[in-house]
Amino acid sequence: MIILPPGVDINNLIDDMKSFSWEASDILIKYAQIIKDSNNKSNILTNKNEEDPVTIADLQVNEMMIKNITESYKNINWEILSEENVKIDPNNIRINKDFVWVLDPLDGTKDFIQGTGNYAMHLALNYKNKCYLGLVLIPDKDELWITNHDTIWCENRNEEYTKPNLRIKNNLKDMTIVTSKNHRNQTLQNLIEKVDFKEVIEMGSIGCKIASILRGESDIYICLS
């Protein structure tokens, strides 16, 4: 049994992370609309790396989430590992706590810039490198997927709940595979063609892909990287 740090209640923790996640949703939706309305998408880019772009939205969500967690849980013995902070200073990352928050403020940045809606925020509280609490926010669908390591559920901003709707299929040829829109390599393409899946759905963000499986819209995701 995993015991949270003293002073941390799991139910209050989930409620706080839900609140922070919807705040992140507001930021992401705001910048998604700015991109949609703008003729110059480079205005919100903070780098020129086409393979790994970073936007103002990434950085604002990153800053807000870290600030909220830090200020709401002062003196708690855990650390926060953020993808954006690793990019900024990869040589200054030292993790030596049992409890570690892992944050990706914007997964699917290319899709975010392209305006497909297939982007997400990922947040997890790990205990000794295993996920204890996980959240995947998909702003475009008003979805927040949550697991408390026992149960998985989805809720919207109005706290309306839905359960996973997994499809049970045994034959690969009857399955719909969900795959990357921007990062599919030739090895995976060859595998898809050889198996001859019933349908191939392309989308960004691993969180969006897994959510599509949980909704019952697809059946399988394969990552070869």
Question: Where would I find each of the regions flagged by the language model?
Answer:
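Residue-level signal for inorganic ion chemistry
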Residues: A24, L28, D58, I69, ...
